From Swiss-Prot:
Belongs to the ClpX chaperone family. HslU subfamily. One of its GO terms (molecular function) is peptidase activity. It holds the Pfam family AAA_2. Keywords: ATP-binding, Chaperone, Cytoplasm, Nucleotide-binding, Stress response. Its main location: cytoplasm. The gene is hslU. ATP binds at residues 22, 64-69, 275, 340, 412. GO terms for cellular component: HslUV protease complex. It is found in: Cytoplasm. It comes from Cytophaga hutchinsonii (strain ATCC 33406 / DSM 1761 / CIP 103989 / NBRC 15051 / NCIMB 9469 / D465). ATPase subunit of a proteasome-like degradation complex; this subunit has chaperone activity. The binding of ATP and its subsequent hydrolysis by HslU are essential for unfolding of protein substrates subsequently hydrolyzed by HslV. HslU recognizes the N-terminal part of its protein substrates and unfolds these before they are guided to HslV for hydrolysis. One of its GO terms (biological process) is protein unfolding. This is ATP-dependent protease ATPase subunit HslU. InterPro entries: AAA+_ATPase (IPR003593), ATP-dep_Clp_protease_ClpX (IPR050052), ATPase_AAA_core (IPR003959), Clp_ATPase_C (IPR019489), HslU (IPR004491), P-loop_NTPase (IPR027417).
Length: 464
């Protein structure tokens, strides 16, 4: 699917999201359109391309119904830089706390890491060969010429029926034998001594009137001026290979290209998910001052509208970044946001609270369903676990009942219920339960473990 990621149709995007998220079709439909519009914009006439702005989305719904998961899966589908921030963590400029521009810097950081990973993949074969040769040189140094003829620096020998012509041929054969052993992992525990670059001490800069990006640039510049120190370390070949792969990859990757591509990726494909947007909305009911709530909204406005943000990798224009905001809006309403910010989130989608039937489907259908996760965990101990259908229905009923009576935390309730149900089993494996055995979870077992707790409301508040 990698080659076609940018070309998925809205129907295909929804089908992909359906593999992981149950229900919420309106939300899936709208994010699918937003993602496809990215591709449409990139293929529009050059004159109009700059004029087409993304339609930002506001997701409204209680916790645990899939708001964050929809945004995260969308970013994976698009192979796009993605960052999640909480609006309540930001403060108005001038107050102590994170400023809103830091979300763009986080997004660029994600993009840089993505591009670096792609570039490393491109040079992987070449770098692997270089690292292999370095490790071989450490184990079997090549033959050096002396005044007395050729002498090998290695005393290693190999089993062969043929008598080598000279030391150089023996050395080559030994190296090839060791090359195969390195590739197969046979020598992973063998110790070698390598020079490792040491990280220089952190350089502190007193901010004063400087913004965060300027301070980071100065810190990086001073850090680059410091001499690079190396230290000899004795490591296993497995550990040495990891370090050498990083160092040799860095030599082949042009960081200027990485920065340029990362900024392009951020500007045209970046997705910022702003959670808890309702926490910075003023409900207008309180008499006290709303400390910096409206200020945070006003600081958010230019970022969402489109502005230039300085980062340590360069200037990023936020005009075409897709913003997805989410909030429960229990106390406040979307209309409590300042009008200018409301206007920047033209698409509003209300997500439904999860029903008992939804819980059942969540346990059974998604690729990453909780039941499959527990099966994968126990399979590592060679124990198989099976869930009867009526057991899944009983778990769903209990989770739904607890959400109604205690606190509605959405699908996260399934985690607490399943954890309590399987607690004893997870503790007993492998000491009391034999390997290659099968454990069956029945409705009777679910009732035995959970029904009593659900009936005791005071206890269920603390345990489930």
């Amino acid at each position: 699917m990698t080659a076609l990621q940018g070309f998925l149709t809205p129907t295909e995007i929804v089908a992909e999201l359906d593999k992981y998220i149950i229900g919420q079709h309106d939300a899936k439909r709208n994010v699918a359109i937003a993602l496809r519009n990215r591709w449409r914009r990139m293929h529009a006439d050059a004159d109009m391309r700059k004029e087409i702005m993304p339609n930002n989305i506001l997701l409204i719904g209680p916790t645990g119904v899939g708001k964050t998961e929809i945004a995260r899966r969308l970013a994976k589908l698009a192979d796009a830089p993605f960052t999640k921030v909480e609006a309540s963590k930001f403060t108005e400029v001038g107050y102590v706390g994170r400023d809103v521009e830091s979300m763009v810097r986080d997004l660029v950081e994600q993009a840089v890491n993505m591009v670096k990973t792609q570039k490393k993949e491109e040079v992987k074969i070449k770098v692997s060969q270089v690292v292999e040769d370095i490790l071989l040189d450490l184990l079997i140094p090549p033959v050096k010429s002396t005044g007395m003829g050729f002498k090998t620096a290695s005393t290693q020998s190999i089993d062969t029926n043929e008598i080598p012509d000279n030391d150089q041929e023996l050395n080559e054969r030994t190296r090839e034998l060791f090359r195969e052993k390195i590739r197969s992992g046979e020598l992973d525990e063998r110790k070698v001594e390598i020079n490792v670059q040491q990280q220089g001490p952190g350089v502190g800069v007193v901010g004063g009137a400087m913004d965060e990006a300027s301070m980071m640039n100065i810190q990086e510049m001073i850090g680059n001026m410091m001499p690079k120190k190396t230290k000899k370390r004795k490591l296993s070949i497995a550990e040495a290979r990891k370090i050498l792969l990083e160092e040799e990859s860095a030599k082949l990757i042009d960081m200027d290209d990485v920065k340029d591509e990362a900024i392009r990726k951020t500007e045209n494909m970046g997705i910022i998910f702003i959670d808890e947007i309702d926490k910075v909305a003023s409900s207008k009911k309180g008499n006290g001052p709303d400390v910096s709530r409206e200020g945070v909204q006003r600081d958010l406005l230019p970022i969402v509208e489109g502005s230039a943000v300085n980062t340590k990798y360069g200037t990023v224009h936020t005009d075409h970044i897709l913003f997805i905001a989410a909030g429960a809006f229990h106390v406040s309403k979307p209309s409590d946001l300042i009008p200018e910010l409301q206007g920047r989130f033209p698409i509003r989608v209300e997500l439904n609270s999860l029903t008992e039937a939804d819980f059942y489907h969540i346990l059974k259908e998604p690729k990453n369903a909780l039941t499959r996760q527990y099966q994968a965990l126990l399979s590592s101990e060679n124990v198989n676990i099976e869930f009867h259908d009526d057991a899944l229905k009983a778990i769903s009923e209990i989770a739904f009942e607890l959400n109604v009576e205690v606190e509605n935390i959405g699908a996260r309730r399934l985690h607490t219920v399943m954890s309590h149900l399987l607690n004893e089993l997870l503790f007993d494996v492998p000491d009391k339960i034999e390997t290659h055995s099968t454990v069956v979870i029945t409705k009777e077992l679910v009732d035995q473990k959970l029904k009593g707790l659900v009936k005791n409301r005071d206890l269920s508040q603390f345990i489930l």
